[in-house]
From Swiss-Prot:
The keyword Methyltransferase does not apply. Belongs to the CesT/SycH chaperone family. It comes from the Bacteria. This is Tir chaperone. Keywords: Chaperone, Cytoplasm, Virulence. It is found in: Cytoplasm. The lineage of its organism: Bacteria, Pseudomonadati, Pseudomonadota, Gammaproteobacteria, Enterobacterales. One of its GO terms (cellular component) is cytoplasm.
Amino acid sequence: MSSRSELLLDRFAEKIGVGSISFNENRLCSFAIDEIYYISLSDANDEYMMIYGVCGKFPTDNPNFALEILNANLWFAENGGPYLCYESGAQSLLLALRFPLDDATPEKLENEIEVVVKSMENLYLVLHNQGITLENEHMKIEEISSSDNKHYYAGR
């Protein structure tokens, strides 16, 4: 029997016009948007799904980076945005957003993925404007550049 996340993912694939997307054996589904943004969905449990935006490798050579990430995380939390987290296996910074499955629709899922994407863009640009670059083979600063972006926003 399919989980609520699987049923939603099937409807989402149909809505966006892709043949089929599904969760792997680790209950993850990953895809790129516009060949720039790398998104993973996790079938966490039957109550909610997690949406992850892969921001890039955690730069260990910048002493201000950890403090800036804590500042960004507080700002996102205060404004209802995704949370920043660290994935140790890939040594990567992620944006994570919990997506409740009650009353979930493909449109709502698409909107929340958009929140994560916009938040990724914003985080990347703010860090870039402070001289911090995340190593990310998918997200290219020249594709989303803005010279005056100095403040975070939650993407909503």
